[in-house]
Amino acid sequence: MAPFDFRKNKSMSSPDTLQIPTDLLPRDGRFGSGPSKIRGEQITALVADAPTYLGTSHRQATVRSKVGEVRDGLSALFNLPEGYEVLLGNGGTTCFWDAATFHLIAEQSQHLSFGEFSSKFASAAKEAPHIKDPSIITSEVGTHPTAVAEEGVDLYALTHNETSTGVMMPIVRPAGATGLVAVDATSGAGGLMVDANEFDCYYFAPQKSFSSDGGLWLALCSPAAIERIESLAASGRWTPAFFDLKITLDNSRLNQTYNTPALATIHLLASQIKWMNENGGLSFSSGRSRTSAEILYSWAEASDFATPFVTNPADRSNVVGTIDFSDDIDATVIAKVLRANGVVDTDPYRKLGRNQLRVAMFPSIDSEDVASLCACINWIVGNL
Ligand SMILES: *Cc1c(COP(=O)(O)O)cnc(C)c1O
């Protein structure tokens, strides 16, 4: 037997120097849940259009037609029924929550709160002095509650995919409810199937399934949601212009935003929507995520050191997978080794505090790369 070589042993087990064999590595190492992977073709298309597009006025035809492409493309992708409209504004989803407290919630909202993001809209509604305290239904992290029709509630706030825990929920109108159904689909939109008849407002930001950058919000609004916006705007309720959804509506109808948007973000978004629509629409894009999810969860279930965090298989998200590790393995070390090898952002949601990795499986992420990631994790655990 060869004499014990301390240096060799150290280089084999220190996370900083563990080198994953290149044939195991995914072709693209981006697995972050937002901002997330942007496809090379989107960048190429942006670069090609740059000389006549970037650095030009958002009030002129070139940019406005790109915004029009986004609005029409989303209507097609989500098969929006007659009368639904696509609104967009600056500030991302977090800004939209505040806008919703002014111009979507009339008196009282009900929130399903089952993680960091869904709880944030509930807090925004609770803080707003001009509406009643919301009704909040919570459930354990790793599960989701169910909305129930409630007297006095005029808006039901659902979350398609709770990005902090990796739980997805079906979008259905609560039985017997008369209020609007507003869905935070920031991480779910484009990666999960949805029926537009089941919502009045399906809102998101483009840095997740839509492979663009942050800072913008988009909302698919039913005629009932538009009517609510118009009546609250006419009600005399004081509203800062930035959160005024009537101003947003008027600008969106002209393919503009109230103030200057990031033009690159809109271009990248338009490319992604086009890619989805040209390849078969939402069944194509959500199908890619579903295939990736099947790979990730079946790997974890077969593993003797990893398990899906979400117990109910139906609740396990197709777009953001959360995987727990057994106590003898430190997930932060795995994430660190992966990062040192160019495979990034698999860290769990910071406030969840579990021995876990979180893997984005948005439509842009190739399923073969998810399979490679699983192989890399197996290799790291075997070599630590
Ligand atoms: C990322 C995310 C948000 C926050 O989006 P911002 O654009 O950063 O405000 C909100 N809700 C969900 C479900 C998310 O995944």
Model-found features: residue ranges?
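Conserved active-site segment immediately N-terminal to the catalytic lysine
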Residues: 196-207, 217
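Conserved N-terminal alpha-helix of the aminotransferase class I/II PLP-enzyme fold
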Residues: 50-99, 116, 120, 124
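Conserved PLP-binding catalytic core of the aspartate aminotransferase-like
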Residues: 307-337
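PLP-dependent aminotransferase-like
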Residues: 94-154
